[in-house]
């Protein structure tokens, strides 16, 4: 994929940050020394960590140059590094690894979660949140349109970039032997958005990118028109004209 677009991502900053707040609230540490925010994006989640633990050394990690540029502007004086979390290891002494909406993009992420828990200090925390929405209309429609002509050959690989998340029991079996305590839960958010086009704008910042990035501008416009029509049918307006974007998310908090 092309580089992430921080400006597009931040169009729905409050809604995207809410799960990070909910995840952070479940970390039972008062005074961590080192904290890593992996998949930090434009720094909205990193800012939450800095505010909660101002005494800690907080480092943001991401693969996107544009996201890191935005994060450094947002939090000058804090440490941000460009790295792939599939190969990144937390520095010695790390107490918290915070992973908000990133592991869904990492193949075989269970093994990486095991590796990160193993690298934590005793009592350290791996806190993870992932969208669990591939079976929601917003994402089903992406694939349905992509499987049509004239896009089906060009977008054949797009639907393979993300797999459905494993069942909660798989996370439990993989992580429980490494932990003193393990919490796993789902939360379903119902985000109030202006209209169907707002849903399209939301997913253009994340899940829709593998489908539109490979397309030239005329093809992209045609794809988006077909996708938007399906979204409008799948998300009818409420009595006040707004629409509700149903968004399930999986949370995991592993305490070593």
Swiss-Prot record:
Keyword Nucleotide-binding: no
Family: Belongs to the methyltransferase superfamily. Tam family.
Organism of derivation: Rhodopseudomonas palustris (strain BisB18)
InterPro entries found in the cross-reference section: Methyltransf_25 (IPR041698), SAM-dependent_MTases_sf (IPR029063), Trans-aconitate_MeTrfase (IPR023506), Trans_acon_MeTrfase_C (IPR023149)
GO cellular component terms, A-Z: cytoplasm
Record-linked Gene3D superfamilies: S-adenosyl-L-methionine-dependent methyltransferases, Vaccinia Virus protein VP39
Chief location category: cytoplasm
Pfam name, any one: Methyltransf_25
Compartments (UniProt record): Cytoplasm
Functional description taken from the UniProt entry: Catalyzes the S-adenosylmethionine monomethyl esterification of trans-aconitate.
Keywords from the named record: Cytoplasm, Methyltransferase, S-adenosyl-L-methionine, Transferase
Cytoplasm as UniProt keyword: yes
Enzyme class: transferase
GO MF annotation, one: trans-aconitate 2-methyltransferase activity
Protein name per Swiss-Prot or TrEMBL: Trans-aconitate 2-methyltransferase
Enzyme Commission no: 2.1.1.144
Catalytic activity: trans-aconitate + S-adenosyl-L-methionine = (E)-3-(methoxycarbonyl)pent-2-enedioate + S-adenosyl-L-homocysteine
Biological processes, Gene Ontology terms: methylation
